[in-house]
Amino acid sequence: MTDRYAGRLTILEDQEIDELYGLPRFTPDERVHFFAPSLEERDAADRHHTLANRVLFILQAGYFKAKKMFFSFEFDEVREDVWHVLRQHYPPHHDDGLRAPILKQTRHAQQRKILTLYGYRACDAAERASLVEKAEQTARISAKPIYLFQILV
């Protein structure tokens, strides 16, 4: 864990944090499964004008299907996943055009589209209040941080 968190309470070990919140590391079979877009997902991906944005959309959708989270990454960090998407979905292309940094606004726009595709929406004030109430009730049973974390996650 980094020094900036040295004074904080430790609930999970670094490996546990990575397992829960880290970028997925897929096997070849998992790549086939998670990067196989539905017709609707493929249509949404293909609406992007550049190959880079199409590949980014399929990657983000696949990672979201796996972990129900979004991640910040560059193509060179997920090279094997990029190659898989190119081979499976855009075979005449190669990764030469995928060198530029991914724009934040593009990433966020795609994430909003993915959330809509899967029927997710933002948490409203009533739902946040319900979570706070559940946390308060849970703390009455046990104030152990790991217990609270497990119940609320």
Segments (PLM) and residue ranges:
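Long amphipathic alpha-helical coiled-coil/heptad-repeat bundle
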Residues: 2-153
